[in-house]
Amino acid sequence: METKNEEWVEIFKDMIPRDNYKIKVLLTNLADEQEIRLIGEKNRFKFSCFCYDEARFFSRELYLSAILDKEMFKKFEKDNFQNVIYEVKNSQLVRKLEYTSYYDPGTLHSQHYIIITQDSVVEILVSANSDLSISQY
């Protein structure tokens, strides 16, 4: 299970109000930045960075019932996963990719984020050379 021994840290907590967000668009325009847009009933946000190393999409139901470690699920379910985005420390996915990459082991250094909305879960790996930013649109 990929979430075993990982630590999820809430990020952008004070910037993103509670809402029923859905992921509407994933833009991959490398000339500018890559964006994941969230549309809520009252709010709209976009997460952007220069380049994602990896992006994986899941239905929320599948991710929360079959992929997420049960202990992690219990920890965050009490708030109905309202934070929307978490940075994953000690990411096993990053470690797996480091060992299977063409780089020397330990040199990939991606940051792992999980975005949970009402209908989807997106896991993204952002290159350590690129920062994930948030803005309203």
In which residue ranges do the predicted regions lie?
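Surface-exposed, interaction-prone regions used to assemble/regulate multi-protein complexes
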Residues: M1-Y137
